[in-house]
């Protein structure tokens, strides 16, 4: 695996409403916003700055392009965010991280094993466009590679990933998306690479389409249906005849 365990990762989260005073169970809210989640990876000189609402990403700041990227483009038409604020936070966290590394004698972060699940966005119909979702949870440190494979070959088109989204225990989760057209000829895998894994983990997915009935099965079903129908007709006729017979003796001739 190309990621070295010896590399140091620094993580500091500058958040709002993630750690309420008195504990998380003391405050109940209908909605929770997490603002300014900042992650800095010292070994690669990269970072991440995101805003979340109810666990969903609102936007992140592309630190290389120095611009705000909205999860849903229409959000950017209603509100705005100056990316310079994110750049200032990254500079502060980098400075603080250097101090913490010296105090901790450059102790590496503890690696947690991520958990991955693959599922489709909508019920699968062959030939109908759909989306595969690879949900990866319990990520720490937040350094991970997620790759989509079709028939064991990497895919680069139609793929999208969220940024790292924070959990209540300060681990992270991430979702990778793949737009595709289901086919019986294709199988898909979500490949996950992380420092905690000795080798990549593959999560397999292929369409589960009910097999069509054979001609023999169709014939048997039709014969059974016809037999049940005939039995119903015969039984119904018998009941009608018995009913008529039981009514006939009860009729008495009237006076002449």
Swiss-Prot record:
Which InterPro entries does the record match to this protein?
Answer: Ig-like_dom, Ig-like_dom_sf, Ig-like_fold, Ig/MHC_CS, Ig_C1-set, MHC/Immunoglobulin, MHC_I/II-like_Ag-recog, MHC_II_a/b_N
Q: Which residues lie on this side of the membrane: Extracellular?
A: 24-218
Subcellular location per UniProt equals: Membrane
For whether the record's keyword set contains Membrane, the answer is: yes
Could you tell me which species this protein originates from? Rattus norvegicus (Rat)
Listed A to Z, the keywords are: Adaptive immunity, Disulfide bond, Glycoprotein, Immunity, Membrane, MHC II, Signal, Transmembrane, Transmembrane helix
Gene Ontology terms: biological process: adaptive immune response; antigen processing and presentation; antigen processing and presentation of exogenous peptide antigen via MHC class II; antigen processing and presentation of peptide antigen; cellular response to glucocorticoid stimulus; negative regulation of T cell proliferation; peptide antigen assembly with MHC class II protein complex; positive regulation of immune response
Chain intervals for the UniProt region annotation (Alpha-1): 24-111
Q: Where does the record locate the signal sequence feature?
A: 1-23
One GO term in the molecular function aspect is: peptide antigen binding
Superkingdom of source: Eukaryota
Which gene name does the record give? RT1-Ba
Annotated Ig-like C1-type domain ranges read 108-206
Write down the glycosylated positions: 145
Q: Name one GO cellular component term.
A: lysosome
Which portions of the sequence form the region Connecting peptide? 206-218
Here the disulfide bonds are 134-190
SUPFAM superfamilies per record: Immunoglobulin, MHC antigen-recognition domain
What family does this belong to?
A: Belongs to the MHC class II family.
Membrane topology qualifier: Single-pass type I membrane protein
Residue numbers spanned by region Alpha-2: 112-205
Transmembrane segment boundaries:
219-244
Q: What is this protein called?
A: Rano class II histocompatibility antigen, B alpha chain
Residues on the membrane's Cytoplasmic side span 245-256
């Amino acid at each position: 695996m190309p990621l070295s365990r010896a590399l140091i990762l620094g993580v500091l989260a500058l958040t709002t409403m993630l750690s309420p005073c008195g504990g998380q169970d003391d405050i109940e809210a209908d909605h929770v916003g997490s603002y300014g989640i900042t992650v800095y990876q010292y070994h690669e000189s990269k970072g991440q700055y995101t805003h979340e609402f109810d666990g969903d990403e609102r936007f992140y700041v592309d630190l290389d392009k120095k611009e705000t990227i909205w999860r849903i483009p229409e959000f950017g038409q209603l509100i705005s965010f100056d990316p310079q604020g994110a750049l200032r936070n990254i500079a502060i966290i980098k400075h603080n991280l250097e101090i913490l590394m010296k105090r901790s004698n450059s102790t590496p972060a503890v690696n947690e094993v991520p958990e991955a699940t693959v599922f489709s966005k909508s019920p699968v119909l062959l030939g109908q466009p759909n989306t595969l979702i690879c949900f990866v949870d319990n990520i720490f440190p937040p350094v991970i590679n997620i790759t989509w494979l079709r028939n064991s070959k990497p895919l680069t088109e139609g793929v999208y990933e969220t940024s790292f989204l924070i959990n209540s225990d300060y681990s992270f989760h991430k979702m990778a998306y793949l737009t595709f057209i289901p086919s019986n000829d294709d199988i898909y895998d979500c490949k996950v690479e992380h420092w905690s894994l000795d080798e990549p983990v593959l999560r397999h997915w292929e369409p589960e389409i009910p097999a069509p009935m054979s001609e023999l099965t169709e014939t048997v079903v039709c014969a059974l249906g016809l037999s049940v129908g005939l039995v119903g007709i015969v039984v119904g006729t018998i009941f009608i005849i018995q009913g008529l017979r039981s009514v006939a003796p009860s009729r008495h001739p009237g006076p002449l």
